[in-house]
Amino acid sequence: MELLIDRFHLEIPSDLEESKFQQWEELKRTPVQLRAVNVMRLWLEYFCDTDDEKALDLVEAFANNALIYRHVNGMRGMLMRLIRRCRQGSGNLNRKMMQPKMQPKPLLPPSLSQLCFLNISPIELARQLTLMESETFLRIYVPECVNKAWASSDARHRASGVVNVISLHNHITGWVIETILNEENVTQRAAITSHFIAIANYCYQINNFSTMWAISSALNCASIYRLNATWALVSRKDLDIFSEINQIIQPTRNYSRYRDLLDRVNPPCVPFFGLYTKDLTFIEDGNSDSLWSDSRLINFAKRSLAADVLYEIRRFQFVPYNFVRVPSLFEFLDLHFKPRMSDEERYERSLKLEPRQSSSPYGGNYHRHDFTSYDMIPDEYFMKRLQENGFT
């Protein structure tokens, strides 16, 4: 902010002829000052946080003391209104959201006192998961996404919103894995797997790509993927749905199918945040902060690339979902989100449920290769980047 204020106070060149002062004033200083004030306005509208007290003080002092020029004097009142609104906690306009009018009625089981996973509608589970994901995603402030703040040693303080999104994603993935592995009966395991596929499919339909991705990642993990006897009892219809979901998140051509889908989607939407951390990490690590020819020159191309990613994040923070929050289902999910097994323990549990064998004993109309031909192509580089950014 200090540099922006310094830019506003553009000094008159020492060698400027008096006869050319008016021209310099109109063509140089006035446009520079208007742009500087406009950047302050944009920051107050979209990026300021109530914690940015020092920066707010600077802008307030600037507005009271510097905006005396006739061509920007009208902006003083506007800046002061935005400062007051930001300090009241409503200055960030991307938090002022449109609210759909109609709320769909929750699809609840007969009894909420003793909830069982398979007795809860996959549609309603998808809605409640979407509310969880959306509320967490909407709490992310853009500054948290700059300079890989989420991967810093003080990430919990600098990027709490991003950290919470990553944590929720990991909890959902672990919940899916352990819910399947905790079932001894193979028929019930297959039913649970189909239930999760139905949840992922409805999440896809309502643009909750974050939960969809988390469920797909869980079902594709080694502990679940190898359960041939379980997959043999999953219907062909459900397998086709799961295959289509996997096609959407394939890494081919830098996840082009998912990115194309995201470009066309209308909010509300919960995007998969892991792809944003991948893109921002690539931009941060692959581009210098300044131009190689002069370290004093800022590399604006790098900032422009990052701004494109940040703009897309903000685009999905305008419109929230309008589902009815069901407290008992939130409590059910919170209770089961607590992981109880390590990755090694999960794999050992998987081997205990279905020991290694050359082929599925269920055979019949199902062959594992029928499914894997559609399955997601592994992207080791992407998975490594996700793990570095906290995703499991």
Which residues are covered by each model-predicted region?
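Eukaryotic small-GTPase/lipid signaling interfaces
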Residues: 1-392
